[in-house]
């Protein structure tokens, strides 16, 4: 049957698979039909959607390529796109070229951008780091605030709850009291009432508690309720009123605040508009200056960025030509024309003066703007202050919130305490419940014991029953299994019949369907054939059409090809024409180049050439483009050809294909007809096969029916067997019932026996008899048992034997079954194979059907049918063999079944006999067990009674211990209360501290407000005071920080106390947990008791054995009882001792403090709990060993003692900790008080400082008035100058005539001397002396390391070529700005000077002077100098050794400082005398020597001070001066232009704010030793000098230099190098407009450190260095272009304006880098003579020059900015200025662009600053100007005027207070430690004073004159500030090294210190202390670094 079912399942599966395959085939057919339909619609176009569905790429192409487009059209489009692409590429090339050019420009500026980017990135990093820190801090603060808020909330809530509950408790207690009293009175007892007097009532709460809480009856209660309701309503109304009032007041406040804010906003807007108007005015001013410049010079300045790059206006070639042509004409002009020119000059001067006035007004405006800026900063600071204050308030509020939270926590604690009390009450109740439960448990245990005995009996019965049940179930299951097998056989047979019938019907249907499908397919193939024939015809037509189209296209392409050929020819022609043009152009170029060689001056040809070149380039590009196009055209033509050829080929191919298709279709038609006939034959054969299959099926059905009958017979036999098994089951059930009855009888007998036994127990006599009888019964029972065992063993052996034989049979049977199963499996496999073969056949049939439709021969089909027939035959044979085997297997199966039945019968018989034997044995065993159980029960009853007593006693003890523990817990709670109180006290203290903190904060706010108010009152405070205020402010902030830290500490302490409270609570919780544990342990003990009871039951067995011994047992039992009682007594005594010890522990614990008590008690609780556990364990073991328990108890006692000692020690530690905490709190309080006192002191100090500031303000106002007086004096000077200028005009004209007589000399000199000024962008090489445009000088100071030695070394003085410079006036307060006038010399002098041509022409200089020392000498304090008249003035000479000048320049934000040292009036009080110290740069010594020579002013009549050396030198110098005058005047003037400009120059006011060029300084001795050639020259000219006494004495500066041609070339080289470097330096400038031409105010005391200082180094004496000049641009230009006109004598009148004092430097931080050193030839230092000017005016009455806080750094002395007249009148020859050079500067955008121009002299041969080439270079030396401070009285130049340097170095000079002295004084420097050094590279003087040891003595005489000098030699100023911050300090602090002193050279000189011959730039920090008005700045590369006192960042000002 199973096989049958499996076969059927396989069959169904196969059918399913076949069905699925058929359905798949049908689907494929449908798809094929659809495709055929679509192919029919080929003529119709597909829609876009269909196309996209088919292939998206095709759809995309279809969108682009329209259906009408032909291939040629497509290709045409492609060609067009290619052309476009070419054009685009060419455009791209052009663009890339432009881009490359732009990139080059950008790369040129890349260093600037790099530097700026680096700075910006650095700043960004710092900002980012700071912001990150800030955010972190803010997050921390926020977190802390959140935590405090939460804590405050909780604490406030709990506190309120606590208060409410306390009030409730009070009220309730009062109510209860009153009610109790009423009760007592009602009962009749007398109760004394407390009289409550109304006088004692202090608060509303007391009134409420007394009157509204209590009531005696219900009526009173109702009355009270009514009162309470009334009070509630009233309170609610009042609350609402209050809320309304508060909201209204808040709203009004907010409205006011809004109005204030709006008004402030309006003010800010107005200020902004004001600033905008200012900016517009500044822009207009800049434009005006630009126009003026273009008018005067003819130079059109480019836009801001371009002007920043060019230092001087380019010399227009037109102007130079005019000048050269006009010079001969000027000879013929009459006197009238001269007069007209003079008038014109006068007019120009007047215009200049008016311009000056305007500039002055603008200056004032600038100051006001700056003042406004400062005020804005003040407002910002205020806003910051308010922000901080609000933050503080916020913090205080947060703190209050925290306090509220703490209170809430306290309430929580109280609530928790109440909870603990409740829990303790619940524990007591639970203990009572536990007691009751234990009693119940005992009862239950007794019942349990009885129940267990019964349960055991029942279990045994149950087991027996189970055994029988299992047997029966097994039998039943075997019967059921047989029945199931028979049923399955029947059902399988039926299903086989059904499935066979179903399969027959399905096969019929399938065949019918297949036939129908085949017929359909035939029809379809016919249709397809017809359709294909139609398509073939269509294709033929289409192909004909295409051929025609292709022919047309071919013709089109041929035409196109011809066109392209024509185009090509044309292009070739064009190319040939272009080549011809090119050749012609080249010829023209060649001719023009030859013409150019002939006429270099003609610039037009060059332009033509350039144009031609550009055209050439364009034409070349065109040619290239055309070539590319030609290439593309040719390639296109070739492609067209290839396309045409391809089309022809494709046509031919298509024709061939159509023919092939026709042939194939005909062949297929034939094949299909043949295939149809084959299919019909196959159909017939398949029908025959079908009939055969039916016959086979019938046979198989008959066979199956036979099998079914056989199976039914076997089923009937099985049923008979099942009935027999059921009969056996009934018999066994009856047997079971009988056995149960027997059991019941036995139980009844046992119960009776038990009762009898109990009675016998009561009677002791009957016990022994019962025992004997039991023994007898036992012996008999044991004998019976032995017999039973023997029989059982026999039966077991028989059973084993039978089981072994049965197992063998079973194994045999299993083997047979497995063989049968393997056969079945084989059959199944064969059957499966058959099915697979059938499936494969069917598949083959289907495939053959399908293939037959395509290509199938009848021969193959026949073969396949034969194969199928063979397979069917084979299958039939196999089936017959399988049936035969199956029959044999069935027979064997029956035989084995009969054997199995026989064996089972035998087995049943054996089992029955065995069971009978077992029952007998069990009965005997039960009787014995029952008897033994009865004996045991009697014994256990006695034992249980005794154990119950013991357990009850133990329970009572445990209850007592529990009560003790509860009492301890209560005590712990009481201990926690004082802790809470102490916590509250601490919180109160913290509140107090907070209040104090608030007060302090309020004080701080008040003082801040006051300081702000004072600051706003004072417009410009003293720098010192400002620093003090800042430092005090820092101190205050530190104090505030300390206070906040302390408050933080207090908070942490509060937190600690909270933590301790929490720990206490946690300990309490742990105690509760311990209680629960104890309970759990109690339960465990009870469980253990139960276990012990079981143990006792086991012990009873041993007692039974003892009973056998009889009476001996009783006596032993009694003895044991006695001993037991004793042991119990001992245990109780031990427990009593334990209790006593616990009591002593309690007493000890009561002594402990608040915190320690709780901890100690918790620990003791734990120990006691442990003890409890131990004692419980001991009690369990007491039954066994009492003695062990006693020893353990003793051990526990010792442990407890130890614990006690430990806890006492812990107590002491806790006390110490508490004491320490109290001391800490006291200390913090003391600290807070001290800080309060300190704050009060700070307040007083601030008030004092405010008063001082007010006084200083008053002084400043006085000084302003004095400056106004000076302005009036200056005006009178201008009138004098105008008259002088007229004279000079005449003299110049005369000189022109003389010059014509000496044309040779004039031509020679310009060639030698001329140093052309080039724009800063030019970077030509050395030797370009003949270039048309003159180079400019960028003079800036560079610090140099100074080492002094006795041996003087000759050093070449590098030349300073100074370019003209527009110096805007310093932004100052509206006081009179000083002016510098040019004093003309007499005609005689000029003529005499002209006689000598050898001398170099040197102008009197500001920043551009040759070698004049522009600083005042060290003035001795002991000599008050009177002011003398003009007649008393004598000429003084100044010998200047080339030195490296170290000075720190403070430039005003917009001006660089070309300084004119023109001394004409005593108003300025310039002292031309200067001290010169010679220091050779030998590494051996570093001590600066005292200068040996001082110049004496003619006004001073102190001959005893002047040494012989100086007199001799003066005489020599005078001679030299006259000689120079002659030589220079002869060599100067070429043109009328020069005359015109000379007039301007001579009348020029030389701005004191121009750049200062350091002059080489050397003593007379050194000069004598080093430059003998020069002295000889001087002696040769002495006579002429003496013959010409000066009518007016002037400050004349003459440089005697032997260097001529060499100098020229070097100048060019220098300038060109510097130009390159200047471009780089411009990057350093902070603002884009601050360029080379910008000038800073010379009054700056700026720390000149930055990039200049860093790169500067002292030059080694051996190394030859070309040091650059001062001026921060870093560009040295040979200033030879500036001539002194013919006079050669110019007086510098310099006035000191104190306006500069207040001027802060906004751009003082800026500084540009200096270019590197260039080696220089050694040359003798030039000498210069300074002629003292006439003093025209007296000094102002009270001019003070405080030199406050001078640092030990070499400080430059300042000149106040003199505003130069004639600013805008400089021509192309503005390089040849007799006085100061004018450096053309673009006007600044930041409002400080007042320009001071120097006049220009056209045609005058240019002179040159710088030493002759053959002189040795002086690397560095010191000029002891530092001693000025020590001498007390300072000259005019003692002010840090010459510390200014040009803007390009990045810095600007802040003007500080100028120093003025009553009269020029020449004094020897007394202090060797204080020194200044000049850079060796400059011929222009530059002075820095270094006050290493500055004495504070000030001359009283000088002070009386009103010209005293204040020197603050504070310990700070000298000690702390005098130290110089630099990388390499190699000298002592007293003797500042040259490294500290910035030199004027732009190129860093090589170090002159020992062992340093390298020229590495070293970073240097120079600290300057400004004058009171100024701001000190420290310059450093890339940014500002402020240190020391008063270091203020620009951003702060």
Curated annotation (Swiss-Prot):
Q: Which tissues is this chain's protein expressed in?
A: Expressed in epithelial cells, oocytes and egg (at protein level).
Q: Which gene encodes it?
A: tpr
Q: Is Cytoplasm among the key words of this record?
A: yes
**Principal location listed in the UniProt entry:** nucleus
Which intervals carry biased composition (Polar residues)? 1306-1321, 1328-1347, 1446-1487, 1561-1587, 1692-1709, 1817-1830, 1879-1899
This protein is called: Nucleoprotein TPR
Give the residues annotated as coiled coil: 1-36, 101-277, 335-1103, 1129-1305
Species in which this protein is naturally found:
Xenopus laevis
| Amino acid composition bias (Basic and acidic residues), ranges on this chain | 672-702, 1290-1305, 1511-1529
- Ranges of Low complexity composition bias in the record: 1950-1959
Q: Which GO terms describe its molecular function?
A: chromatin binding; heat shock protein binding; mitogen-activated protein kinase binding; mRNA binding; protein homodimerization activity; structural constituent of nuclear pore
Bias (Acidic residues) occurs at 1601-1637, 1644-1667, 1902-1915
Sorted alphabetically, the keyword list is: Cell cycle, Cell division, Centromere, Chromosome, Coiled coil, Cytoplasm, Cytoskeleton, Kinetochore, Membrane, Mitosis, mRNA transport, Nuclear pore complex, Nucleus, Protein transport, Translocation, Transport
